[in-house]
Curated annotation (Swiss-Prot):
Biological role stated in the UniProt entry: Specifically methylates the pseudouridine at position 1915 (m3Psi1915) in 23S rRNA.
Reaction(s) catalysed by this chain's protein: pseudouridine(1915) in 23S rRNA + S-adenosyl-L-methionine = N(3)-methylpseudouridine(1915) in 23S rRNA + S-adenosyl-L-homocysteine + H(+)
Record keywords, A-Z: Cytoplasm, Methyltransferase, rRNA processing, S-adenosyl-L-methionine, Transferase
CDD domains from the UniProt entry: RlmH-like
Record-level Gene Ontology MF annotations: rRNA (pseudouridine-N3-)-methyltransferase activity
Phylogenetic placement of the source organism: Bacteria, Bacillati, Bacillota, Bacilli, Bacillales
Annotated source species: Bacillus thuringiensis subsp. konkukian (strain 97-27)
Subcellular location: Cytoplasm
Gene Ontology CC entries for this record: cytoplasm
Name this polypeptide is given: Ribosomal RNA large subunit methyltransferase H
EC number from the UniProt entry: 2.1.1.177
Pfam families on file: SPOUT_MTase
Quaternary state and interactors: Homodimer.
UniProt record similarity statement: Belongs to the RNA methyltransferase RlmH family.
Gene field: rlmH
Length: 159
């Protein structure tokens, strides 16, 4: 399976970079995983609704440029479906079973994802009803993908 994590914004925190590097190393035994960092759109603090839409659309174009037609796209969004680790593992296993060898997880910028990215997505996933920093979500997502492979192979992993 080829997994892409497409994320808006540059990761700056060293501890997050280290955690991500560790999970990428662990995942290399199970799948080809790449993290694609795309620049965020510079925007002032107090944006109007129209300006927010423009920012999301510009970021959305960058995201969609990185997704091929045969890729199964999972958008990370607060309004997405919440799953347990076991349910997430089953859904990843099903994708592999049904020949979906390319999977892209999409993490938007601070304003979220554009409507075009959401339309292109095959499903939407939420890790919490809470708002979490998109940089942190990369690490949490990689950990859950790793956990899914361990679950699907019946390998031990701490709970």
């Amino acid at each position: 399976m080829n997994i892409s994590i497409i994320s808006i914004g540059k990761l700056k925190e060293k501890y997050l970079k280290q955690g991500i590097a560790e999970y990428l190393k662990r995942l290399s035994a199970y799948a080809k995983v790449e993290v694609i960092e795309l620049p965020d759109e510079k925007a002032p603090e107090n944006l109007s609704e129209a300006e927010m839409l423009i920012v999301k659309e510009k970021e959305g174009i960058r995201i969609l440029d990185k997704i091929s037609d045969d890729t199964h796209v999972i958008a990370l969004a607060i309004e997405g479906k919440q799953k347990s680790s076991e349910e997430f593992a089953v859904s990843l296993d099903r994708l592999a079973t049904y020949g979906k060898s390319k999977v892209a997880f999409v993490i938007g910028g601070s304003l979220g994802l554009s409507s075009e990215v959401m339309k292109r997505s095959n499903e939407s996933l939420s890790f919490s009803k809470m708002t979490l920093p998109h940089q942190l979500m990369r690490l949490v997502l990689l950990e859950q993908v790793y956990r899914s492979f361990r679950i699907n192979r019946g390998e031990p992993y701490h709970k």
